[in-house]
From Swiss-Prot:
Highest taxon in the source lineage: Eukaryota
Membrane topology: Multi-pass membrane protein
Basic and acidic residues bias (residue ranges): 1-20
Post-translational modification Phosphothreonine, affected residues: T328
Cellular location(s): Cell membrane
Knockout or disruption consequences: Cell lysis during cytokinesis.
Lineage: Eukaryota, Fungi, Dikarya, Ascomycota, Saccharomycotina
Described function: Polymerizes chitin, a structural polymer of the cell wall and septum, by transferring the sugar moiety of UDP-GlcNAc to the non-reducing end of the growing chitin polymer. Required for mitotic division septum formation during adverse conditions.
Protein name: Chitin synthase 1
Amino acid sequence: MSDQNNRSRNEYHSNRKNEPSYELQNAHSGLFHSSNEELTNRNQRYTNQNASMGSFTPVQSLQFPEQSQQTNMLYNGDDGNNNTINDNERDIYGGFVNHHRQRPPPATAEYNDVFNTNSQQLPSEHQYNNVPSYPLPSINVIQTTPELIHNGSQTMATPIERPFFNENDYYYNNRNSRTSPSIASSSDGYADQEARPILEQPNNNMNSGNIPQYHDQPFGYNNGYHGLQAKDYYDDPEGGYIDQRGDDYQINSYLGRNGEMVDPYDYENSLRHMTPMERREYLHDDSRPVNDGKEELDSVKSGYSHRDLGEYDKDDFSRDDEYDDLNTIDKLQFQANGVPASSSVSSIGSKESDIIVSNDNLTANRALKRSGTEIRKFKLWNGNFVFDSPISKTLLDQYATTTENANTLPNEFKFMRYQAVTCEPNQLAEKNFTVRQLKYLTPRETELMLVVTMYNEDHILLGRTLKGIMDNVKYMVKKKNSSTWGPDAWKKIVVCIISDGRSKINERSLALLSSLGCYQDGFAKDEINEKKVAMHVYEHTTMINITNISESEVSLECNQGTVPIQLLFCLKEQNQKKINSHRWAFEGFAELLRPNIVTLLDAGTMPGKDSIYQLWREFRNPNVGGACGEIRTDLGKRFVKLLNPLVASQNFEYKMSNILDKTTESNFGFITVLPGAFSAYRFEAVRGQPLQKYFYGEIMENEGFHFFSSNMYLAEDRILCFEVVTKKNCNWILKYCRSSYASTDVPERVPEFILQRRRWLNGSFFASVYSFCHFYRVWSSGHNIGRKLLLTVEFFYLFFNTLISWFSLSSFFLVFRILTVSIALAYHSAFNVLSVIFLWLYGICTLSTFILSLGNKPKSTEKFYVLTCVIFAVMMIYMIFCSIFMSVKSFQNILKNDTISFEGLITTEAFRDIVISLGSTYCLYLISSIIYLQPWHMLTSFIQYILLSPSYINVLNIYAFCNVHDLSWGTKGAMANPLGKINTTEDGTFKMEVLVSSSEIQANYDKYLKVLNDFDPKSESRPTEPSYDEKKTGYYANVRSLVIIFWVITNFIIVAVVLETGGIADYIAMKSISTDDTLETAKKAEIPLMTSKASIYFNVILWLVALSALIRFIGCSIYMIVRFFKKVTFR
């Protein structure tokens, strides 16, 4: 059969002699080999044609004598052991990526400088008969090229040893014993050099390479990138292989039979090179003639479809006893049984007829030769498992709508790269792990790295975050007068999604990432050569944009108005908390990319359409080391979530924190916390000591017992803020940006709310203590004396706020008791009874909260906590009524000019302090909100916050301090399903089962789209049922707590009745007073209201509250005034 194929191929080749253009096209395919005379004539013809261009000079690799000898033997068909190398082995790179690739001729003795750009032609003795020689672009030396892999410890070859990256040197000799150069990037060998060559091409001959040419649309993609118009290749083979602007990279797929790297997208080229007999056998059409392959070729969408991953003939399995050499590029099986992708939640669904080939009759007659997966041969890249997998045809068809020529799509759009990371984050460069941005011919500089951390959030929450990011990228792409942003802005932004634990990730989140092209399953492994995989990394540049998010749907779209997004999806094997995710981001990928700004977001946080850009603008000030925007509460469609009082109260709390706290702290230059849900840091500011202190919380658990530090690192973002500002010999400051905002989901149920605040309160308290104890480090920083004084004042201000918070439990009770007793003394009636009833309710709720906090989980006692919050809300209503009632009565007495005058009322300590307290809180809220120009929360959320404020003080604080020993984040590890292991052979290769056909890859893509289709928001909204053991444990704990509460209360009643305590004595005394008596009569009856010490304490606390309110009001006013003048000045 093989001889028959060869004869047919020779006959077909002889018939095509008179078609030089066709012959040239297939000169490097590995299937046709012209005679020496033909190749010499063709070479001379193209040399003359390009001579007029004047800009192309031959590039030669510098080799030592023994290397040249080995190369000569290789190109002449000898492997150095007197073994003849066949054509397929010699043309390993044929048909790979852009297949017009030229084998470089060896250097001569006269080429002793690789950077020499002379334009002389090569001597004839160095032009081999079997390899045509073409002029290549000249070489220019760039002296200030940034490092590709920073702080890498691996030894790099010098320019003399390895003048430029030679892909042929690696792929042509991967079966030889000598060492092959690294393929880390196009200029890998120059990572530590001051100069390295790059390909240069004159402006008038700049070709389009593999950059997609976009249609005319508002984003200005039709500018040809940097204003250069696309030109033809002028038959330059180097231009056909590598994009001259550097926007393509070398893929790493799998090995073929002869050890060559296989290009999955080379189906049409390989089919065109077959003889009619081979095509007829390959296509397996029994019902009609092939017609010289014309119908078959027309049925293939060039550039859209990829051939199957590793096309093997059935005979190969019986002929060989191992799978190492089971590949042939002479026979390609084309399958088209994919299920059309359609989705009600996606606009990227393909039609029934929109399959890999357009001829339905042809595809119906093709028989499947094998199943969807087969074992293929791979080779570790620098000891790491790296695999570029083709994406589904649905995505390719959608991407094709964004460009006039689908063949111009670079590899970053056609492939998804997978890496199995087997090291710690700070060892990525050392262990030869890299990212695609560093592998382009011209490595991309990253200005902005967006880090999205997620745990088990669903596709709706993840989609909200990604939609906000995509909207911001669109905004920056539209910028016309920016020196940083513009049509190429997307190339400077990398979106890094880090999921905490493979066993915890939500299946629909994986489905969403798969629909974007950034996730495929089937080849991930959890062990490589007995090294555990710590993270699975998926890289892809998607053109699919999220256009709309509803409660149940994520709408996707791909057209000429969408922008590419560079996605880096990192799936951690184990659940190791959020701080570990940030460690991967900062110490791992940020060290590789070296971004200027790193923005942190939580999955579920949706930034505004230009919020990321506005946040980035804050860093125009070179002293700004970190910044944050406004965190808003997601209020739902038409603000429906405001009907939930818990959500409304949090909305008011977030608003007032931004209006009063963030603005004031921004004026000082130190913000106590840049929320991890939406904040940004200058990478230069956090490197070194700040990050070391930030990540200490991850490793200290293995060093012993650290109660204080463990609680402190529950709010690790506060530690990072403090370390940035106090960094030795540096003058970094933190700023708040009012123009930037992001909405986030907040707890809607009481148990989740309590658990969240437990971590916040404990972490913030211990972090504040840490900053107070080390505030002296401000004076060792690089700030000027004025800034140091301001920061010192701010630390004293923060200390007083912490002091007030510490005594908030007793302070609130004192205010409550004074109000209820005062109105009972003054006006008797039912107030006497209510003062005792509410006192007992207050005590019972407080005692019960203590008992339940010590032994029960909020989820198992949700009803009790809800009841407690309701009781405290009723008591707050009564307190407000008492305040208003006493104020009204007092003014009535003043108007009547009766026994109590206005001066006497003001001099009454209790009444005066209450007025000051109310004025420094509620009146302050209203005035500052008006100044901030956002007063609407006062109308929609103020009442809910006031009613729940007693629960903030009592329930949340009590539960937090009763569980100060609980250092968890509400997460725990779980075992994920095993993925399998990889163990390489002596030659560094291994065998693995993968999806082999484009239809199977399409089916995998459709599977995840179906997961999105089957989403039922009602079923997701229902809380998950606890297990039987959890129910049993919770039941026993509840019974125990109720018994303790009942026992304590009943015993206290006996003591209170016998000793007349607990308000009973006060009630009896007030009852004996006539209703006509005034407050002065009540004082003569010697009913103690407050002791002198209690009065002093009460006055101090209230005046501190008033002073804190005044400082925040002044800070808010100054911030808005400065912001106004900045807008006027820079407009």
